[in-house]
Amino acid sequence: SIAGILNDKPIDTSMGLTPLEGLMMGSRAGNLDPGLVVFLGKKGFNLQKILNKESGFKSLVGKTDIQEIMKIGNKKSELALDIFVYKIVEYIGSYIAVLKGFDNLVFTGGIGENIPLIRKEICDSFGFLGLKIDKNKNSKNLEVISKKRSRVKVYVKKTDEELMIAKEVLNL
C-alpha cells in the first residue's frame, strides 16, 4: 500500500474498505473499473475468487511472488512489472500533487525493503523533481539510499508489522 503523509499524519492511502483497492498485488487486481465487476457478475463468475485469488501478478504471469516473476524475464513478466511500477508512480505522483511537493520517500514492506530494482524504477520516475538515488546504497538496501545532492531523501525502513499490532493491542 501507499500513503501520503503530511505533518506525521496520513492524508490518503491506496487501500479502501478492503485490500482489493489500490495497487496490484500477487493475486489481487488493485484498482479496476467497477463495470468489470458488473460484467463478470452477470456472466456468473465467482467474483470473490477472481478478485482475491486469481488477479494481479497471478493473472498476468501465473505466479504471485515478485522475486520469481523478476527471474522469468519474458514479455509477460516485464509487462507485469511495468504495470506494477507505473501504478506505484501514479499514486506517488498524485500524492505529491496533493501535498504540493515532497521531502521524503520511504520504502517499506517486503518489496520496498528488499527489491532494489523496483525502488530504482520508481525513483527514476521522479528524477525530474530532483530525486536522485545512490546505486550502491540502493543495491545494499541501506536505510538512506538517496544521494547527498538529492532534493528528496529516500529511505528504506524495516518493518515489524506483528510488533506494531501487538503494541496497538496493548494500548486498547
Regions found by a protein language model. Name each.
Residues N31-G35, N46, V61-T64, K76-L79, ...:
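Conserved active-site and cofactor/substrate-binding residues in soluble primary-metabolism enzymes
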